[in-house]
Amino acid sequence: MSRGLGDVYKRQIQSNMFTNIITYVWWDSNSTCYLYHNKIKRRRITMGRKIFISYKYWDDDVYPVPRFSDYHPKVRDYVSWLEDKFQNRTEHYYKGESDNEDLSMYSENYIWDKLKDKMYDSSLTIILISPNMKEPNKWEKSQWIPWELSYSIRKTTRAYYTSQRNAVLAVVLPDKHGNYNYYKSMRLFSILQANIVNGYIPVVSWNDFKYNCDKYIDKAYEAQKNTPEYKLQINI
């Protein structure tokens, strides 16, 4: 039985005729799973999230990532580290593009359609903040990250299913000297800054996040739940 995005889905998985206990599995709209039966209170289980990552691929003013950076470190190395962690050491699912997935030969419209497909099938967007993520001489509407954030926090309906707004977490990466001081004076994209200020997007340093991903992922979902919809800035 399939489950549409944004739906609540419950399924009976076990029934014991001798004890009259019926066990159910329950997913909510954020893909959080619960197990419960009719004799005890339901119990929450940590389940994998579908995660999209928004970042500036070629920003090279970042600290090297062990095992993933060569002589020319770049932000993509952090994405590869997270992709490896999610796939091999957690229950989370990485929904972004792989490093060997070259879309440069395609039109921007085609690339945007592919990105929207990935974001539609996700429930959390992680934005990697790096020193040069924002190009100073280009309009914000001409850069990918604001569009990815805007799409992530919209409710989007396709056919019979509606994808709810993603939770969003901003992770500040260390610069090439291993410092985070640049973030204090950095001019962020307007849509990102506004949704940090209104409480929708928690911010964490890479050093804290990499050792306790689930803690900060949960914080993003809490912020999503606790921030009134009217406070969100959705447009770029």
Where are these regions (language model features)?
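Single conserved hydrophobic/aromatic residue that forms the stacking wall/gate
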Residues: 1-12
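Alpha-helix termini
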Residues: 89-91, 155-164
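Short, flexible/disordered intra-domain loops and linkers
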Residues: 60-73, 135-145, 181-183
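Conserved TIR/SEFIR loop-to-helix hotspot centered on a Trp-containing motif
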Residues: 132-158
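Conserved N-terminal substructure of TIR/SEFIR domains
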Residues: 15-124, 221, 225-236
